[in-house]
A protein has these predicted regions:
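C-terminal regulatory/oligomerization modules of transcriptional regulators
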Residues: 1-6, 133-158
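N-terminal leader segment of winged-helix/HTH proteins
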Residues: 1-36, 83
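Key DNA-contact positions within bacterial/archaeal DNA-binding proteins
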Residues: 71
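Charged, amphipathic alpha-helical coiled-coil/dimerization segments
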Residues: 79-134
Length: 158
């Protein structure tokens, strides 16, 4: 696919568009969390468990990712486990720790809610050239790293 001409934009316009996207996503996360019977924080934690795949995270890993205390993440995991979203498994290398695994049926339920939106995003990506997709991927990856670093430096839980 050849790149379509795109309108010129300044960094300020791009940041404004990004702010609009983030705001819309925040509203969407609240709506989706309600649909699946979770809080936004619990849904975010579950998403990190899914993202980890076979590399099962510990409670400490999740606390760091969600930027909550280990005590708070215990409550999150208790709610997720009671609701059938996760299972806690003993850590094979450290008996004091547990690993967190997503329940396959819960993963399927959450993906079913997101699937129509991701299909639309896939259609949108199809309107861009491979080089443009590479730029988008690079920008999202670097912006995610920057955001995580900023959170680490400025927003640590007590």
């Amino acid at each position: 696919m050849h790149a379509k001409p795109r309108p010129a934009a300044t960094p300020e316009q791009a940041l404004s568009a990004m702010d609009q996207l983030i705001a819309t996503h925040l509203v969407g996360q609240h709506e989706i969390a309600q649909q699946v019977g979770l809080s936004v924080t619990d849904l975010t934690c579950f998403a990190y468990v899914i993202e980890a795949g076979e590399n099962l995270p510990t409670a400490g890993d999740l606390a760091a990712r969600v930027h909550v205390t280990t005590g708070a993440v215990t409550g999150i995991l208790n709610r997720l486990e009671r609701a059938g979203y996760i299972t806690r498994l003993p850590d094979p290398t450290d008996r004091r720790r547990v690993r967190v695994a997503a329940q396959p049926d819960a993963v399927a339920r959450v993906r079913e809610v997101y699937e129509p939106y991701y299909a639309r995003l896939t259609h949108l990506f199809a309107q861009y050239s491979p080089d443009e997709i590479a730029v988008l991927h690079d920008w999202f990856t670097r912006a995610s790293t920057l955001a995580a670093t900023y959170l680490e430096e400025h927003c640590r839980p007590d």
